[in-house]
């Protein structure tokens, strides 16, 4: 599985203007592209080069605000901080991978969505719920759009 993931990341990195990265992430991880987009809206306001500094000293990088906690594993796969900041498709794929990991723990649920941001500690349950509620609002708005408007947004975000 790791080799497949590395190959996909490599393919995405050579074609950063690829507008279908949201749909590719959806297919790879069986997570709706609209849900991933809703997370990116909340995490970075759709800014691929976004950098967030956290109180615990960690840093969040890129469109999907990938926490520096994951960098040791990502570096072993050949993914750098620079790539997360400069290639939105890599950020989307990595974000989908992290959300998929949370879904292995919590199932396809809003608890898993909350864990994407707040982690799995039982002490952070309320934070997970608040975060999931924000994502739900973004997701609900996106699901209410016409297919044409939705495709336009997904395409624009992939090419930023």
Curated annotation (Swiss-Prot):
Top-level taxon of the source organism: Bacteria
InterPro entries from the UniProt entry: Lysozyme-like_dom_sf, Transglycosylase_SLT_dom_1
Keywords noted in UniProt: Signal, Virulence
Keyword Transmembrane helix part of the UniProt annotation: no
N-terminal signal peptide: 1-19
Family statement drawn from the similarity comment of this UniProt entry: Belongs to the IagB/IpgF/P19 family.
Protein name as it appears in the record: Invasion protein IagB
Organism of origin: Salmonella typhimurium (strain LT2 / SGSC1412 / ATCC 700720)
Gene: iagB
């Amino acid at each position: 599985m790791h080799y497949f993931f590395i190959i996909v990341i490599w393919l995405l990195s050579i074609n950063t203007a690829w507008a279908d990265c949201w749909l590719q992430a959806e297919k790879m991880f069986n997570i709706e592209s609209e849900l991933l987009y809703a997370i990116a809206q909340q995490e970075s306001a759709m800014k691929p080069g976004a950098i967030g500094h956290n109180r615990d000293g960690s840093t969040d990088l890129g469109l999907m605000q990938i926490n520096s906690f994951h960098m040791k594993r990502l570096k072993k796969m050949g993914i750098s901080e620079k790539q997360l900041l400069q290639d939105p498709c890599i950020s989307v794929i990595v974000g989908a991978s992290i959300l998929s990991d949370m879904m292995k723990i919590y199932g396809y649920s809003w608890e898993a969505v909350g864990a994407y941001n707040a982690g799995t500690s039982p002490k952070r349950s309320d934070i997970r719920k608040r975060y999931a509620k924000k994502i739900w609002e973004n997701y609900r708005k996106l699901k209410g759009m016409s297919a044409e408007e939705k495709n336009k947004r997904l395409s624009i975000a992939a090419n930023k």
